[in-house]
């Protein structure tokens, strides 16, 4: 529970810092990331609203893990489902009905994440949870949150590297290929996410199973769980990539009707 409380405090502090830094420097950063004169206004409108809701986003991303590790996989899944469904409902209302455009898309995302954050905090402070979020455990202690940061470094480096590569690609494409090239890259990235997100779900879902059996000193079950995950990921990735290679235009058409981009 001390780890839970310390991680919550770190997330709150990080969200405050990120909100201030990125809100103030949003236009400059977007330029650095490759936004052109045409896309800068839209990107800035979306970013400023999304940044203001970074607290809710970080709570959902960071605290939902504590629900999964306790064995409440369904509750954890409902967090994602609730956010996704609300976002799907609000997007067309804000974008088209209210005519808010990009700002509406950002607001819909923030509101859906806020509902997910409330859902998580209500569960972690409720009676069903095994580990309860308490104010007394929110005082930062290096010996408590230090190991958490150490364990997260590898994931941080991996995701940061992916982000830097994405920024580099976008900036280069914007400079040498224009908005059409950036749009094409965005479509490719979206298609790749269709592949990677289920893989992340499989791997994250297997983490508690492997952890429980490792702690119970059952190496055979750990190996079986890993082998099952590995084979599932290989089969899914191979099948999906084969379909995309055979029908590339069909997948591109999901995200745009522009023939030039397709």
Locate each region found by the language model:
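Small-residue-rich hydrophobic transmembrane alpha-helices
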Residues: 1-20, 57-76, 184-248
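Residue-level signature of transmembrane alpha-helical cores of multipass secondary-active transporters
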Residues: 11, 50, 76, 80, ...
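Structural signal for membrane-spanning alpha-helices in multi-pass inner-membrane proteins
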Residues: 22, 65, 91, 95, ...
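Helix-terminus/linker motif at the lipid-water interface of multi-pass membrane proteins
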Residues: 30-37, 93-100, 156, 160-190, ...
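Alpha-helical transmembrane segments of multi-pass membrane proteins
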Residues: 37-60, 187-193, 259-262
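Short runs within selected transmembrane alpha-helices of multi-pass transporters and secretion channels
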Residues: 50-68, 76-84, 105-118, 200-204
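Membrane-interface helix-loop junctions in multi-pass transport and translocation proteins
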Residues: 84-118, 248-250, 254
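Interhelical loop/hinge segments that connect adjacent transmembrane helices in multipass membrane
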Residues: 109, 120-156, 162
């Amino acid at each position: 529970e001390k780890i839970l409380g310390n991680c919550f405090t770190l997330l709150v502090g990080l969200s405050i810092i990120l909100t201030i830094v990125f809100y103030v420097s949003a236009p400059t950063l977007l330029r650095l990331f490759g936004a052109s004169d045409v896309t800068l206004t839209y990107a800035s409108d979306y970013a400023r609203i999304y940044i203001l809701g970074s607290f809710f986003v970080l709570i959902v991303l960071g605290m939902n893990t504590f629900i999964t590790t306790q064995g409440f996989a369904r509750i954890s899944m409902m967090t994602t489902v609730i956010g996704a469904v609300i976002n799907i409902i609000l997007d067309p209302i804000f974008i088209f009905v209210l005519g808010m455009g990009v700002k509406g898309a950002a607001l819909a995302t923030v509101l859906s994440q806020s509902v997910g954050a409330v859902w998580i905090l209500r569960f972690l402070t409720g009676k069903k949870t095994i580990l309860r979020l308490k104010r007394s455990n929110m005082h930062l202690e290096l010996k408590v949150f230090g190991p958490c940061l150490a364990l997260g470094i590898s994931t941080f480096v991996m995701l940061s590297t992916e982000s830097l590569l994405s920024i580099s690609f976008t900036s280069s494409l914007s400079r040498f290929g224009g908005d059409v090239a950036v749009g094409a890259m965005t479509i490719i990235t979206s298609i790749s996410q269709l592949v990677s997100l289920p893989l992340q779900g499989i791997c994250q879902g297997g983490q508690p199973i492997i952890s429980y059996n490792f702690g119970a000193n059952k190496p055979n079950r750990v190996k079986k769980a890993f082998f099952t995950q590995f084979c599932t990921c290989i089969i899914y990735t191979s099948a999906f990539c084969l379909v995309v290679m055979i029908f590339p235009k069909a997948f591109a058409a999901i995200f745009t009707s522009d023939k030039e981009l397709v």
